[in-house]
From Swiss-Prot:
Topological domains, Vacuolar: 24-762
Glycan-linked positions: N68, N112, N152, N200, N291, N333, N450, N521, N542, N569, N663, N679, N688
Note in the entry: Present with 206 molecules/cell in log phase SD medium.
Transmembrane segments: 763-783
Chief site of localization: membrane
Name of the protein in its database record: FAS1 domain-containing protein YLR001C
Amino acid sequence: MNMAIQTIKYIFWLLPILGLTQALLQNPGDDFPFSTVIDILSENVEFSTFLRIIQKTGHVQYLNELQNFTLFAPINSAFIKGDQTTDQFEEHFHIEDFLIHDRVLQVRDLENGTYLEKRAAKAPLLLRKHERHCFVNEIAVVEPDLLPSFQNASLQGINNLLLIQPQINELLVQLDEETQDLKIFSDFISSFSNYNAYTNSSTVLVPLDVNFRKFFNTIEINYLLDKYNKLGKSNTISQAKWAADRTSLLQELIIDDVYGGILPKELILENKNNRKLFMKSNSEGTSVSVNNSDYSPISNRIFEIGVVHGFSDLDFLRTHIQFDAEKYLHGLNCSEFVKELYFRDLEKFIQNGRKITIFVPQASFNEDRGYTKPSLLYHFVEGKIDLEQDFSSLRPIQYAPTQIYDSAFCSSAKRLGGHCQKFKITRSNKGYYINGRFKILNTKPYEIGNTSIYSIDDDLQLPGDLVLSLAPENHCSISLMLLKELNLLDLPSNHKGYTILLPCMNSWDNNDLTIDYLRSNKTALNLLMRNLIFEDLIYSNNYSISTTVKNLYGNSVSIGVQKIVGSQNLTKISVSTIKESIIIEESSDIFFNQGVIHPIDQLDFPVDLEISLKELIETTGTKEIFDFFNLFYDLSSIIWNNEEYSLLVPTASSIPLSGITANSTNLRKFLELHLIPANVTQNLLDCNGSISTKLGTKLNCRKDHLDNVFVSIQGDWTKEVRVLKTGCTTNLKSSCIFLIDKPISLSWLNSEKYHLRLPGIAVGFGVIIGVTIAISLLFCIIITRGGKVKDKNQRGRNDRATTPLIQHSPIIHNPSYSATAHLSPLSQPTFEGSYSVNAIQTPRDIRRVGSDQKGGRSVSTS
């Protein structure tokens, strides 16, 4: 072994001596036999600029000592073509940018095609041979294969400068501008702060946007890119999952070392996830394929320390990434919502495989909300909701179809007895709404595994207390006022929940007097309202149930719920303590924090509550009515026995002004004029149709633009009374009291006597007689007028001689300015008669009403 080493040393010592001996023996005219790349550069003037830069930067010795390399030397014209000046080039000059180590390139030996030359710690070079022409990084080799004799090297003269290659993120931006199809991966790479650690000296398989969208939807892409810049600030668990997914995807697309151009057949490589990949190139090396994909439309694009190939159909992008609801919520810009779930230990709802439906507010409404655990749970349903499928069986008719669902908030034992709080979804022409307030933005859910996600336009709020849960359009203010007077707006916790049948909408119409009575009688008010509240949860979709519950009095009550046959959206609720069945709209339930409210548009009284005519009259304050009716036994029984009549009751202040007293001779007629049979009461309640009185007089009803109700004698609208309030008895809804602002005067009936009513035949005869008399009078006037004219002519002839030639004419008044100047006083109408039919009566001195009734029976002036 030592002998071999000694022999090699002797050889190295002898080589310079032999070279020197050959030089001494050589003739002076012969070329110098030992040349280096520096010698070649100095011997060729076209390389003078490049040589000067090498000398100036001190690389001559370095190049002389190198072996087994290729140098690409720009000719002088390259420095003129380039954008950089020579000084700028010198400033950034690195000799390694122009070298290939461990390879002596000879262009003449290259076959036609594209070749990728690796270089340690430098960007690879792309060589392309076409016929006799060769290019390096698309720069023409104009002086090929210049070989020094004293170095194992080659020099290739090129006509342009080899520029520094861009970083990978810069290259991807450039490629996206060229193709308009590389935005996603470009953003993906840029989102890594240390992407160079993955891509240096690597082959990067770049999926085009079309490739990404083939395997990832928009939500998943948003998650991978962290489009909303939230994941970096999320909880540590979410951050770790996100970082692992992104790293896995990036490593799936990176192969250590540089591969491109013409590749060996059956080339099997591994990516950074240790997945085996089969890579091949086409015959020219201009495009590559991975795992039998289509050949890359973008190939052999060089970056700082690597090469990029772009693909449209890589099939392994999704291999190492498993999506769940949590990742989808991040992709929907709901990272704050996810953070709250972790904070409340509710992350299981977005991680397990159970069927879950989530209603999540859009991004602008889920930031810094400070959710409570119950409010978060109210956004979840343990089961799948498919709106289009769930509502497909509900035909689009006049009403808005509604479905009721259980939320995941089921822990309110005190308030709801452990039952889950519900919500309802209603479909209208404008879309789907939760509890009538929160619009669902996507009718088709985002689905991942067993989870369905709906986005809503605002944060879903848990039902509040009784008052807050009722929207103004329900018109429940009167019932709420009555509940407030009974301190029933906040019900005690009963571990069961409550069901309230609440009169709303039009239920209190025509019941103003009833309200006044109830407010004045707390016993009656309690009897009504407490019989409408039940200690259990009964929903409108609990069809065909019959159960016994307790009302707020503590009494057991039987309740049945049935769907009305033949109706599309009506439900009947039967309550044993209420006289009539209650009809409600299906799914009209309103949820509050202690149960459910059923708004009803009818006022149904408990069987134990009786409101009579007597009590309603007392509520009006017109006590004189009782005195008047007590004078007539048959009439008084109407009030005391609740007979089927309604009564118009004037206000107490208007009775004295009317002149009606207990001594009035027409008192009975007055009372009968204000009594209305029950069978026509509805006409007055509806203010429609003819209204007959017990007296036989017909009344009319009208409403003004403010819905004020006025009643008058039929055929005479000049005198009318206004209905102030109405209330009906509990036994008979057509037996009511109408409080009016003043009585209907009997004098209004007397005015009818002055109206002449003649039959049609009499009118006809009158016309004939009138025409005959008119013709006769005209004939007489003509005869009389003719005689006067004749006499005047005769007298005119006799006086002509004595008549002056000029005489003053008397002043003649224009009859058009004095149409009544010649009327007799008897023919002129009086002021009273022309102003009003009532004005011809002597005015009544109201100060004397009642003052002249000394010892004698007064006579009513009405």
